[in-house]
Design a protein with these regions (language model features):
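N-terminal leader/targeting pre-sequences
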Residues: 2-6, 30-171
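Secretory targeting and sorting signals
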Residues: 1-30
Length: 171
């Protein structure tokens, strides 16, 4: 009987010691894994404000996507996934945009606080790209825009943006 009591006491002591270690490791793993952000078919301004009157687009946003946003040291990374089955073989431009930024600032390719890349969807309509950018001083978060060019307009033919600004802070 006393043997089982000692085993139980040792097990309880081990649990008390291991719980904080496990919690720290789980938190560290979550930070390294990044923040999962859903991509919505919403058009946004460069300051992340929503454009309430979307431009007429050739095709509605029929795709679905996510971005895994992480930061390490002084850089932010976005791994962007999009599935647009109705439009296989389509090229999309993808931007990683740092916030805050003034509403008057532009956020196209080459603008400060932005990084752009692109991908072509495969035969199933899937595409993935990873973008990495140095975090500028004062940056508190980043968001992603995915857009397909419209040959007949300056407005994109199809677009997806982050549901929220993912927090980052330079180390």
């Amino acid at each position: 009987m006393h043997t089982w009591a000692r085993v139980g006491a040792c097990g309880a002591a081990l649990t008390v010691v291991m719980t904080p270690v496990t919690a720290v490791e789980m938190t560290r793993a979550a930070a390294e894994a990044g923040t999962i952000v859903v991509l919505d078919s919403d058009l946004r301004r460069c300051d992340f404000s929503l454009i309430s009157t979307d431009p007429m687009v050739a095709h509605p946003g029929l795709g679905t996507g996510t971005a895994v946003i992480s930061h390490s040291g002084s850089s932010a990374t976005a791994e962007v996934h999009l599935v647009d089955a109705p439009e296989p073989g389509t090229h999309f431009d993808v931007g990683l945009i740092q916030e805050p930024r003034p509403s008057s600032a532009t956020c196209g390719p080459g603008d400060p606080g932005t990084a752009y890349s692109g991908f072509d969807t495969d035969a199933a309509g899937s595409g993935t790209v990873t973008i990495k950018e140095g975090i500028r001083p004062g940056t508190t978060g980043v968001w992603v825009i995915v857009e397909r060019a419209n040959p007949n307009s300056q407005n994109p033919a199809e677009f997806y943006t982050s549901e929220f600004v993912a927090p980052v802070s330079p180390s």
